[in-house]
Amino acid sequence: MNVRDLSFKLNSIFDINKYEHIDKNLNGLQVGNINAKVNKVAFAVDASFSTLKEAKGNDFLITHHGIFWSKKERIVSNMYDKTKFLIENNLALYSVHLPMDAHSVYSHSKVFSDFLGLKNSFAFANYGGVNLGIIADSVFSFSEILEKIKKENKHILFSKKFKESVNKVAIVSGSGYSFFEEALCHDVDLFITGDTSHQIYSLAEEFGVNLIFAGHYFTETFGLIKLMEDFKIQEDLEVKFICKNTNL
């Protein structure tokens, strides 16, 4: 398999062309020699310079947040340094942002809900015609759900319990607080997202909806890790997840 083959495979899985009109991220192959062989693939949330350095020695890096966020970015300053590093180390960079958020299998929100043991999930959180979140049924209490998350991530930004019983949960990974009012329409008992938001606290209190702001980084690891695990099983590739938790 070469860079072109793997890029085409990912383009097909995530149907990236569908998102050109709504996603600021430049989805797909951002940097790479399309004819280079791929044996080792790394996965990471962000294409920070520290991530690129740790990915050195791999042939292909898949990130949720790439280095190009428009089709007109200039390759200067730190962008020049990152691009130069990728080229000099023959490391291809592939980014998949909203196409992963909205994916039926690899959505961070969907995989997160599976991790929590939630059932009967359906998509919500409409953004530009695609759904970025999940609503699912719960048989667990608020305390049980919070404890399960804390076992994986000690740096939960904020949580607030208004009631212990949780029958329905809404999850939107990353910065999903703007979908809180849509979640209210589904009578959820718990709303989970990454980033904190002062503006939804009063609404949550008034409607008795529990809140967990579990961290932007943490909530956007789930789909990547599932994709990595599937690649390890389905493809003859060596895989690695690069953890650079910002605790935010």
Curated annotation (Swiss-Prot):
InterPro entries: DUF34/NIF3, DUF34/NIF3_sf. The keyword Metal-binding applies. One of its GO terms (molecular function) is metal ion binding. Gene3D superfamilies: NIF3 (NGG1p interacting factor 3)-like. Keywords: Metal-binding. A divalent metal cation 2 binds at H65, H216, E220. A divalent metal cation 1 binds at H64, D101, E220. GO terms for cellular component: cytoplasm. Belongs to the GTP cyclohydrolase I type 2/NIF3 family. Homohexamer. This is GTP cyclohydrolase 1 type 2 homolog. It comes from Borreliella burgdorferi (strain ATCC 35210 / DSM 4680 / CIP 102532 / B31) (Borrelia burgdorferi). The lineage of its organism: Bacteria, Pseudomonadati, Spirochaetota, Spirochaetia, Spirochaetales.
